[in-house]
């Protein structure tokens, strides 16, 4: 069975995502504007077996014009089951 996938908007340091990971979901992208929250999130995701999160953690303002295109690049056409 394939894992359900999700994108985390306003991700913070990944607390809500962590619950989804524990339930077996797979993240495709996280969007967060705060640098230190992104750094924490990158470290936490390594704990869950993600080898390199430099691209999947988008450190940017979600209201910027290039945010949605950047999410599309990271998702790479994969199906998104949930947006949190």
Where are these regions (language model features)?
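Conserved active-site and SAM-binding loop architecture
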Residues: 1-84
